[in-house]
C-alpha cells in the first residue's frame, strides 16, 4: 500500500485515505475538542487538537500510527498546560508552544520533552 494521506474530517477527527484508490482506510474521532493540525513524520500522523476547553487530564498533542491507533501523547511542562502550536524543528524534533508560555522541543518518536524554555 502507498503512503497514506491524512485529513481532518468535517466532524473534527482524523481519517487515513489511500491516495491510489481514494478509499478511507481508518478514522479516529477527536479525543477532547477538535483536530486543528496534522504533522507528518515518516509514518503515521501527529495530531494537535484545539486547546480551548481541552480536558486538562491529558495532552492535546499525540501520535497515531498508520491505522490511527494512539501510540503516545506529548509530555507537557505542567499538568495543567496545553499546546497552542506545533511545527517541525528538524531531525525528528517538534517545536511546540504552550498556553502557559513554554516552548518545548519534543521527540517525535516518543513524545518526551527534550528541552523546554519559559518564553513569557
Give a label for each model feature.
Residues 2-4, 29-43, 48, 76-89, ...:
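Repeated scaffold domains used in trafficking and secretory/extracellular systems
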Residues 18, 39-40, 107:
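Acidic/polar residues at beta-strand termini and the immediately following turn/coil
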Residues 1-9, 15, 41-55, 89-98:
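Short beta-strand elements that form the blades of beta-propeller/WD-repeat-like
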Residues 45-46, 59, 66:
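Long, charged/polar, surface-exposed segments that mediate recognition or autoinhibition
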